[in-house]
Amino acid sequence: MSKHETKMTRWYAKTRYPKGFLMEEYLALPRGKTNGKRLMDGVIVFRKPFVKRKLIKGERVVVVQSKHRRLGMGLIGQVIVSRDLVERLGVKVMKSVGVCTEMDTVMHRMLRKHPKCRAVVYRAA
């Protein structure tokens, strides 16, 4: 995650879920013989976290992926796949969000067809 994207992920967690706890660079899928590791820019949990703790089955979470550019197919794919990867861990994904610097209305309409997937535009303070 770049320094811009870190700032964007933290902004989203702080403004939308101030009572949640952001776990940055969350490992949703470790590297294996036939797959690469998959990191989420952020996972927001609502129980006090331990340092890089594992998610608890049944726990409600919000998954965050950030890109310092306009909403596009790459970020949309990350939002959808991130939701599915984290759900495989047995948690309840309330929302999977892509944070971007500019909205693309056509792409956002496509993203909204997928349950629990949304995009928001980063507003620097």
Language-model features, listed with the residues they occupy:
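Charged, terminal alpha-helix-loop-beta segments
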Residues: 1-125
